Design a protein with these regions (language model features):
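Phosphate/diphosphate ligand-binding glycine-rich loop within oxidoreductases
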Residues: 47-127
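A short, basic/flexible loop-to-alpha-helix module at the beginning of a structural domain
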Residues: 128-135
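Structural motif corresponding to alpha-helix initiation and N-cap regions
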Residues: 15, 33-40, 54-58, 79, ...
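N-terminal glycine-/charge-rich "phosphate-binding" loop or analogous flexible N-terminal tail
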Residues: 1-48
Length: 135
C-alpha cells in the first residue's frame, strides 16, 4: 500500500504524528508542497492521499485509478471535487471538529478588540505615549 502526503507544510511540525502512516503502508511519500501540475504524477500509483489544500478533481482522479481514499487535514472540503470523488469511488475524510475552541477564542478576542481598541492602545504605548495623544 502507498500513502502520499501532498502538502505537509500545512501542518506545523509536531502537530501530527505521521508514524501511523508509516506503520500502515509499505511506502509513504511526503511532499512539503504539490502544485496542481504535479498531483497526477505524485498520486499515480497511490492508494491513499493526505492533503490540506491540493485541488483534486476529475482530471487528477482519471490519472490515478488506484486512489481509494483522501484524508484532509482541514475542516473544509472545498479543495476537493466531492462529486468527482464519488464518481471515482474515492472516499473522503476531514476533521470537522478541528480548532472549534480556537475559533471561538479568536471571535471573543476580536470582539474585545473592537470594544476596547486594545491594538491602538498598545501601539500608542510602543510609540511612547502613556495616554492617547499625550507625549
Amino acid at each position: 500500500m502507498k500513502i502520499v502526503v501532498l502538502d505537509s507544510y500545512c501542518v506545523r511540525p509536531g502537530d501530527l504524528d505521521w508514524t501511523g502512516l508509516y506503520d500502515l503502508a509499505d511506502v509513504v511519500e511526503e511532499y512539503p508542497r504539490t502544485g496542481y501540475e504535479l498531483l497526477a504524477d505524485h498520486l499515480r500509483d497511490a492508494d491513499f492521499a493526505v492533503s490540506n489544500k491540493c485541488r483534486i478533481d476529475d482530471a487528477v482522479l482519471d490519472a490515478c485509478p488506484r486512489l481509494r481514499w483522501v484524508g484532509l487535514t482541514a475542516t473544509g472540503t472545498d479543495s476537493l471535487d466531492l462529486e468527482a470523488c464519488r464518481r471515482h469511488g474515492v472516499a473522503v475524510a476531514n476533521v470537522p471538529g478541528y480548532s472549534t475552541n480556537s475559533v471561538a477564542q479568536h471571535a471573543f478576542a476580536l470582539l474585545l478588540e473592537v470594544a476596547n481598541g486594545t491594538a491602538a492602545r498598545a501601539a500608542s504605548l510602543r510609540d511612547g505615549y502613556w495616554q492617547s495623544g499625550v507625549p
